[in-house]
């Protein structure tokens, strides 16, 4: 898989990109400087100022629009401070919180390796099904399947 890495903000974000590139290579992936040819796009966002937040949102949208077929992973301060807003942006397949940034390449490998579905699609809901009086669960088939349920 070809991966394009992009960052906004501080030197720490830049250092993390270097670490991720090394880890992705160790997992057998290639790193590309061309986002249009990448299979996976990783954006490390910033939220130190309102302008940085705007730039983060703009970069996520622009990156997705330039290569909508690629998976899009977003991490960094903007993603961690505003996960709902970030996850609602078009094309975002996976959010990685700052607490898990050191595991980003392995999380990407496990969470996105088996298809296109976002992580949230197979996480248990806040309320169990029986507490809502339901006998059936809903599966969003348009999001794909990672074959991790008891049915498979």
Regions inferred by a protein language model and the residue ranges of each:
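Proteins enriched for Cys/Gly/acidic motifs involved in redox and nucleic-acid/cofactor modification
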Residues: 1-152
């Amino acid at each position: 898989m070809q991966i394009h890495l992009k960052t906004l903000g501080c030197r720490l974000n830049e250092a993390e990109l270097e670490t991720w590139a090394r880890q992705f290579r160790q997992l057998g992936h290639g790193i590309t400087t061309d986002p249009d040819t990448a299979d996976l796009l990783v954006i490390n966002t910033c939220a130190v100022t309102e302008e940085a937040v705007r730039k983060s949102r703009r970069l996520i949208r622009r990156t997705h629009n330039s290569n909508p077929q690629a998976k899009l992973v977003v991490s960094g301060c903007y993603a961690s401070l505003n996960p709902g807003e970030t996850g609602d942006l078009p094309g975002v397949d996976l959010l990685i919180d700052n607490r898990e940034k050191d595991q980003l390449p392995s999380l990407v490998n496990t969470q996105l390796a088996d298809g296109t579905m976002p992580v949230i699609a197979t996480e248990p809901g806040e309320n169990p099904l029986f507490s809502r009086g339901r006998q059936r669960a809903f599966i969003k088939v348009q999001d794909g399947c990672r074959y991790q349920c008891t049915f498979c």
